[in-house]
């Protein structure tokens, strides 16, 4: 299990980098040059919602990128709209602009193409469900380790 555990960690990291490269290629093929792959993933995670930068940070993994910086760049390039909360002036909420919604649709079509290709026998739906379940357990384990400290050993997985 030692080798498998370390291999999974390395695989998750490689998959994330490869997927970001796929997003970059998609942006290039669409002629979109004013947003990078990480920003496009942040944009995709916003979708049709409105949220704070803090909420956005919790929703996705952006390889240690500065989400606030990326939000600022997307604002400058017209992909998002930023509004102060009427209840708490310190809180800023973001949502996609029309330009952002257009790119979101392009990203959604990319995901749909990928799913169609995968369904041709590359990966079965049950395989994705099983991988998702296992990765969620790892996520809960690592979250527990962070919350309890690096030496935390007692962990009871949720079903």
Kindly label every feature range from the protein language model.
Residues 22-65:
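N-terminal helix-turn-helix DNA-binding core of bacterial DNA-binding proteins
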Residues 1-33:
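N-terminal leader segment of winged-helix/HTH proteins
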Residues 1, 125-159:
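C-terminal regulatory/oligomerization modules of transcriptional regulators
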Residues 6-9, 13, 17, 61, ...:
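Short amphipathic alpha-helical segments with heptad-repeat character
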Residues 16, 50, 104, 139-143:
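A structural signal for well-ordered alpha-helices, especially hydrophobic packing surfaces
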Residues 72-130:
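Charged, amphipathic alpha-helical coiled-coil/dimerization segments
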Residues 53, 71-72:
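Short, hydrophobic-biased segments on the C-terminal half of alpha helices
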């Amino acid at each position: 299990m030692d080798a498998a555990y370390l291999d999974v960690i390395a695989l998750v990291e490689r998959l994330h980098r490869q997927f970001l490269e796929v997003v970059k290629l998609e942006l290039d093929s669409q002629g979109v040059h004013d947003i990078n792959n990480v920003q496009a993933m942040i944009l995709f995670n916003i979708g049709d919602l409105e949220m704070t930068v803090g909420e956005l940070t919790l929703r996705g993994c952006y390889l240690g990128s500065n989400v606030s910086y990326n939000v600022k760049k997307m604002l400058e390039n017209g992909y998002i709209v930023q509004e102060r909360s009427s209840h708490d002036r310190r809180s800023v909420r973001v949502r996609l602009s029309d330009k952002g919604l257009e790119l979101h649709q392009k990203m959604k079509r990319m995901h749909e193409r990928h799913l169609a290709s995968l369904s041709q026998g590359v990966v079965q739906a049950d395989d994705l469900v099983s991988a998702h379940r296992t990765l969620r357990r790892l996520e809960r384990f690592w979250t527990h380790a962070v919350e309890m400290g690096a030496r935390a050993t007692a962990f009871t997985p949720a079903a």
